[in-house]
Regions:
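Alpha-helical transmembrane segments and their helix-start/interface "positive-inside/aromatic belt" motifs
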Residues: 11-30, 64, 101-115, 174
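Alpha-helical transmembrane segments of integral membrane proteins, especially early/N-terminal helices
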Residues: 22-41, 71-73
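Hydrophobic core segments of alpha-helical transmembrane domains in multi-pass membrane transport
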Residues: 27-36, 113-122, 126, 161-176
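Membrane-helix interface motif
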Residues: 35-50, 124-132
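Perimembrane loop-to-helix junctions flanking transmembrane segments
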Residues: 46-61, 141-144
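Pore-lining and gate-forming transmembrane alpha-helices of multi-pass membrane transport proteins
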Residues: 56-68, 72, 101, 105, ...
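Functional transmembrane-helix hotspots
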Residues: 118-140
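Juxtamembrane interface at the cytosolic side of transmembrane helices
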Residues: 170-199
Length: 199
């Protein structure tokens, strides 16, 4: 009888708090744009800082790749932590299940923010790419980057982006778990203080 009651209570609750997930994803996106703007303000460029033989863009800047990965990790940590702190409290759920749900919220924050960021980037980049197609083609012809070297540059950029995304997903899950743990600790402290008899 008690088991049926607990099962009914759990089924009456949603295991996913979408409002917390969307709030965390929005915070992660906003933090990413702010940090990208700050990095651009400090003069971070896609091209490598050392001179190239052709005088153009034929080297990838590894500093940029590392900073972009760090931006992804930091913004994912912020979004995941917020999702963990803002989610609703689940009643009659084992602590292991609560921890799993918190980390799942972090992964969902990472997934939503990554997809939304990709859509936003494509929306902004496609018109700009169409506008800059002719000048870019002329510049590429002038620089004469070898196709093999261009593929190496693209591979390096993809490597940094992939590593950054993987680290960001892991960080978001861990941060959401920590945020949920902190939320439950504060909730328990609040109610224990209220239940304490007055002197």
């Amino acid at each position: 009888m008690e088991r049926d009651l607990i099962t009914g209570t759990e089924e009456g609750q949603s295991a996913i708090s979408w409002s917390a997930i969307f709030a965390g994803a929005a915070a992660a996106l906003a933090a990413s744009f702010v940090m990208l703007a700050v990095a651009g303000g400090f003069g971070l460029k896609l091209a490598a800082p050392w001179p190239s033989p052709s005088g153009g863009f034929d080297n990838f800047n590894p500093t940029l790749g590392a900073i972009l990965a760090a931006i992804q990790v930091l913004s994912a940590a912020l979004g995941g932590y917020l999702a963990g702190r803002l989610r609703t409290k689940w009643v009659n759920v084992h602590s292991h299940e609560v921890h799993f749900r918190d980390t799942a919220h972090g992964l969902l924050v990472w997934a939503v923010s990554t997809v939304a960021g990709a859509i936003l980037a494509l929306t902004l980049m496609v018109p700009a790419a169409a506008h800059m197609a002719a000048p870019a083609a002329a510049a590429a012809a002038a620089v004469q980057i070898e196709p093999v070297h261009a593929e190496a540059i693209a591979a390096q950029a993809s490597l940094f982006m992939g590593v950054g995304l993987l680290l960001a997903g892991f960080t978001a899950a861990v941060a959401a778990g920590l945020g949920g743990l902190r939320r439950d600790e504060m909730h328990a402290t609040y109610w224990s203080e209220r239940a304490r008899p007055l002197p």
